[in-house]
Amino acid sequence: MKTNNTFLSYFVCGFLLMGVGLGQNQTSEIKVGVVLDLNTTFSKICLTSIKMAVSDFYADHPNYLTRLTLHVRDSMEDTVQASAAALDLIKTEQVSAIIGPINSMQADFMIKLANKTQVPTITFSATSPLLTSIKSPYFVRATIDDSSQVRAIASIFKFFRWRRVVAIYVDNEFGEGFMPFLFDALQDVEVKRSVIPPEAIDDEIQKELRKLMERQARVFVVHMESSLALRVFQIARDIGMMEEGYVWLMTNGMTHMMRHINNGRSLNTIEGVLGVRSHVPKSKELGDFRLRWKRTFEKENPSMRDDLNVFALWAYDSITALAKAVEKANTKSLWYDNGSTLSKNRTDLGNVGVSLYGPSLQKAFSEVRFNGLAGEFKLIDGQLQSPKFEIINFVGNEERIIGFWTPRDGLMDATSSNKKTLGPVIWPGKSKIVPKGWEIPGKKLRVGVPMKKGFFDFVKVTINPITNKKTPTGYAIEIFEAALKELPYLVIPEYVSFESPNNYNNLVYQVYDKTWDAVVGDITITANRSLYADFTLPFTESGVSMMVPVRDNENKDTWVFLEPWSLELWVTTGCFFVFIGFVVWLFEHRVNTDFRGPPQYQIGTSLWFSFSTMVFAHRENVVSNLARFVVVVWCFVVLVLTQSYTASLTSFLTVQSLQPTVTNVNDLIKNRDCVGYQGGAFVKDILLGLGFHEDQLKPFDSAKDADDLLSKGKSKGIAAAFDEVAYLKAILSQSCSKYVMVEPTFKTGGFGFAFPKNSPLTGEFSRAILNLTQNNVTQQIEDRWFPKKNDCPDPMTALSSNRLNLSSFLGLFLIAGTAISFSLLVFVALFLYEHRHTLGDDSEDSLWRKLKFLFKIFDEKDMNSHTFKNSAIHNISSPMTHKTPSPSTVQITPWPQSPSQNREFELRRVSFSPSEERFTTQPIIHHEDGESDIECRVEQ
C-alpha cells in the first residue's frame, strides 16, 4: 500500500513539472485591431504589407514570447463606420492596439476613443496636421505630418522667385488642416485659396478652374486626395491650364500616390508638374521586400496589378515597431476593467472598458528605434520624422528627381549635395523656360496714356500717319517700361491714348470702370483719385511749388563785398593784422634798419608790412628768426582767409543774381497779381483754397506757354507759375538764368501709375520702382530726359548760402595766436636774459629807473646783431680798398646844413646796376652815449 502511494506521488509531481515546463514555452497573444477600407486598392495594398510584417517579424524572432494576432474590420469608406469598427474591436475583442484610421477624416473620433480606453491607435496614412491638436498620448502618427513639407515648398518658391500662388485644396479636414501651415511658410508670398468639395462633379471643378484662369495667378499648389487631384489635372489640361506659363506643384501624399492611380497612366496627365515627397532610401531589404510583396499581393488579388507605395512601407514598419513594443512591455495586465462586460451593446459608449495594458504599451512603443523599410523609424512627440524630401518633376511616364531638401542644407541638386540649386525642369507645355508666375489675362495689359498739349518730355503720343499706330514716349513711359522688366512675370502692355488731356480725373476713373487695366503718365497721386484706383509708389519728387522770375540786378549792392564775412570776423581779422605788425616791429626794430626811424615812420612801416601780407606784397625783409616764424604762420592764415573770402564772395554775387521777384504767396494774393497753373491739373483747386480769386488764375499747357506768360510780367502776364515740382524742375533745367523756384512747397503724392483696386500689379510695380530707385536707374532716366546745363547753379543751394563767421576760423586764429604768443615769450625771455645785469646790479637806482634804462636799451640798435656787424665790415672795406667808381657814376649829394659843424658823412651806394652805380652821402648820427649809427643801405 505504501509502495502504491509512493508511486502515485512521483507520478503527480512529474505531471506537475511537465505542466510547468510546457507553460514556460507558451506565447502570449496580443490582439491588434486593423481598421481599413477593404474595398479600396490602397487598403488592400497596405493590408498585404501588414500581414507580411507580422509573418516576417516572427520568422526572424521565433523566440519572442509575444505574438500579434490581427483582427481586421472594414470601415467601408465611411467615417461613422470606422468609429463603429474601432468601438467593436475594443468592446468585443478587447484589442491592445488599433492600426488605423486610413484617412484624417476618420481619425477624430477614433483618437478620442483611444484616449478614453487607453488603447494606442497607430495611423500610417492620416497626415493632417489638425490631428496633432487633439492632445492624446495614445494617438501615434507613424507617417509624415503634412506640415513638415511646407518649408520645402517655401524653398522652391524662393528659388524660382514666385510671389503669388493659389492653393487648391479639398474642403475637408485633410485640406483645411494643411492651409494654416502653408500660409505661415509662405509669408513673403501672397497666397489665395481655391476650395474644391470632395464630392465635386466635373462641371463644378471646371467652373472653379475657369475662375482661376481669369485671375493673374499662374502658380498653383494642389493638396487633396489623389483621386480627386487626378480629375482636377485632367480638366485643367482640357481647358488649357497645363500649357506654357503655368506652374503646378503637388504635396507629399499626392506625389507618392499619383503613379498608383489608374495603373500609372495618370503620369501623362500631369506632365511638367512638380511634386514634393518624403525620401525613401534604397536598400537591399527594400528591394527583396518589393519582389515578395508583389508575388503575395498578386496571389491575394489576382485581378489587380499595382505597385508598392510608401504608405504600405509605413504600415509594415508600424507593425514591426508594435511587435517590438509588446515584447518589451509588461504582459501581466493584458485585460480590461469591468466596464466592457456591463453591456452587450457593441455601440454603447457609456460601458466601454479601459485597457490596463495600454499605458505600458504606449510607453514602450514611443521608445522603439530601428531602421525600417521606409527609413529610420523614430518617433518624436508621437510623430514620425522625415529628415529629407525629394523634389520631383513628372516628365512623360517618369518621375525625375531634380533635387532634395533637408532642414539643415535647404535645397540641393540631385547630382551634387554641394550645389544649392535644382536640376533642369520640364514645365507644362514641355517648356524649359522658368515661368514668371503671373500673367495678365488676355495676354496684354491695356494701358491708358494721356495725349498732352505740352510737357512732352513726360508723355508724348506719336501717331504714325501710315499705320495710324500710336507710340507713347517720354520720361514716365520709360520709367514704366523699366519697371516692367523688373517684374517676376511677363506683362505685354497695349497702349491706348486718352483724348481729353485736361481731365486726368476722368482718365483715372476709367480704370475704375475697367476701360483700362492701368493708366501711365504724369498722373499725380491725390486723395480723390485714390478712391477709384490704387497707385504705385511715386517715381518723382512730390510737391507743388512756385516759380518766379529773378530780379534784373545790373547794379549790384554797393557793399556786397562785405557780405561774405560777419562783423566779428572782420573785426578779429583787422585786430590780428595790427597785432602782427606790432609783433614784427618788436622783433625787428633793433636789428633791422627798415623798421627804424621816427615813431610815425616805424608805425607806418609796421602796419604797411602787416597789411601788405594780405596780397603777399610786403617788400621789407625780416632778419630775426622769430619774426620769420611769425610771418610764415601769419601768411598761412592769410592764405586761408583770402581763399575763403573769394569763394564766399563769388557765392554771394551769384545769390544776388538769383534773387526772386516774389518770395511770399500772401503778397500775390494781397496784390491780386495773376498767377499761372497747368491746365487740367489739380493745382487750380490748391490755389483757390489758398485764397486766390478765379480771375487771378491763368492756365498754361506747356513750358513755352509758362515762359511767355512770365516774360510779359505781372501786368500783362503772370507774376508766378504754380505747378508740380517735377514740371518746374524741367523748366528750370533749360531756363535757370531766368527763373527760380521758391518756397513754400505744398506736399502732394507725386507721380504714380494707377491700377484697379486690389490689383496685385500695384504692389509689384511699387517694388519694381523701389528697385529702380535704389539702383539709380530712375536718376539715369531723369538725366536723359531733363539734362541740366553745366552753367546752371542749383537755386536752392545758392539761396541757402550763409556768411562765414568767426566760429568758422576760430581754430585757425587760435593756432596763430598761440604760436605768436609763444614767440613773444621767447623774445622777452632772451632780451631779459641778455640784459640781466641791468636789473640785477647793486646800484641804488630805483626799479623804475632801471626799467626806463632797460626800455632805452630796447629802443636802440642791437650792435651785436650780425646785420650791423656785416654793415660795419662793409663800410670799412669800401671804397678805399676796392675799385674806385668812375666819376661818371659817382654822385656826392651834400647833406642839408645843420647846427652841427662836425657832422660826418657816409658814402651810400644807391645802385648795383652793372652799367651804373650811384652813391649818396648820409650823416653819421652821434648819440649822447657816444655810439654812432653807421648805415649802409642798398637801394634797388
From Swiss-Prot:
Transmembrane annotation, as ranges: 567-587, 597-617, 629-649, 812-832
Disordered: annotated segments: 876-900, 914-940
Location(s) in or outside the cell: Membrane
Tissue spec: Expressed predominantly in roots.
Any Pfam family the entry gives: Lig_chan
Gene3D superfamilies: 1.10.287.70, 3.40.50.2300, Periplasmic binding protein-like II (3.40.190.10)
Keywords for the protein's UniProt record, in alphabetical order: Glycoprotein, Ion channel, Ion transport, Ligand-gated ion channel, Membrane, Receptor, Signal, Transmembrane, Transmembrane helix, Transport
Superkingdom of the source species: Eukaryota
InterPro entries linked to this entry: ANF_lig-bd_rcpt, GABAb_receptor_plant_PBP1, Ionotropic_Glu_rcpt, Iontro_rcpt_C, Iontropic_Glu_rcpt_pln, Peripla_BP_I, Solute-binding_3/MltF_N
Record's signal peptide: 1-23
UniProt-annotated glycosylation sites, renumbered to this chain: N25, N39, N115, N338, N345, N528, N771, N776, N805
Membrane topology: Multi-pass membrane protein
Gene Ontology biological-process entries: calcium ion transport; calcium-mediated signaling; cellular response to amino acid stimulus
Topological domain spans for side Cytoplasmic: 588-596, 618-628, 833-940
Function: Glutamate-gated receptor that probably acts as a non-selective cation channel. May be involved in light-signal transduction and calcium homeostasis via the regulation of calcium influx into cells.
Assembly and interaction partners: May form heteromers.
Family (UniProt): Belongs to the glutamate-gated ion channel (TC 1.A.10.1) family.
Protein name: Glutamate receptor 2.9
Native species: Arabidopsis thaliana
Classification lineage: Eukaryota, Viridiplantae, Streptophyta, Embryophyta, Tracheophyta
Gene that this polypeptide is encoded by: GLR2.9
